[in-house]
């Protein structure tokens, strides 16, 4: 089963388009857990177990594990190996040239065993190809990101008047998706850009981070990005789920938050 089949299976089984981002910030974690690599492993594993029937995917951000050195990377490896069912998208934002890109692709897909990865397109097609050739894995191209400064470059206008983010989306559609394993990362904080990209790429999967703590509006995101009966949309939420409670019942609180978000996404989809 390839990544997209695994994603569709989890989405159908759990009636969910929610992806939970695993961004374990020690300062925000429950007080009952240690703030070291073992603590972030325990925290993320508990979140996954509590939400396994409510999500379509998980998205661990590699930076929060790398910050703990070798022990943090080991914690990430353990999480990937013990994932409970829904596929895992490694939020690594890789992008480099030649043999370096080849090594990154081996690290992500062969050594670690992630189901999908986020990629930066700005070094060009040759930097993406080592990942793209893994046809059974997902490759999510950073297109219009959710951060406030994304417009510094991504909104820049080309000679033909298109914003750079739209050119990236169209290249993903026409050049990089030959194996059918490419999706786009488009921030929920930019609903107008979401709508532009959906019009240009009606058949591509969109991963939309930024709902919740970053200020993205769920209903506006769904209206802009959903694509008919098969919405081709994953809504990623991190902090609202992870840090729903800092007490010993943090996992139960995360489950409640995830259920509410899943149901809200489904309600928004029905309203489109």
Curated annotation (Swiss-Prot):
Q: Which SMART domains match?
A: OMPdecase (SM00934)
| Keyword Oxidoreductase part of the UniProt annotation | no
Stated EC number for the protein is 4.1.1.23
The pathway noted for it is:
Pyrimidine metabolism; UMP biosynthesis via de novo pathway; UMP from orotate: step 2/2
Which Gene3D superfamilies does the entry mention?
Answer: Aldolase class I
- According to the record, the signal peptide region is none
User: Which residues does the entry assign to the active site, renumbered to this chain?
Assistant: 93
Q: Does the keyword Cytoplasm apply?
A: no
* A GO MF label: orotidine-5'-phosphate decarboxylase activity
* Keywords tagged on the record: Decarboxylase, Lyase, Pyrimidine biosynthesis
Q: Which reaction(s) does the protein catalyse, per the Swiss-Prot or TrEMBL entry?
A: orotidine 5'-phosphate + H(+) = UMP + CO2
What enzyme category does the UniProt record give? Answer: lyase
Q: What's a GO biological-process term for it?
A: 'de novo' UMP biosynthetic process
Q: Which HAMAP family match?
A: OMPdecase_type2
Give the family from UniProt: Belongs to the OMP decarboxylase family. Type 2 subfamily.
Q: What is this protein identified as?
A: Orotidine 5'-phosphate decarboxylase
Q: Which organism is it from?
A: Roseiflexus castenholzii (strain DSM 13941 / HLO8)
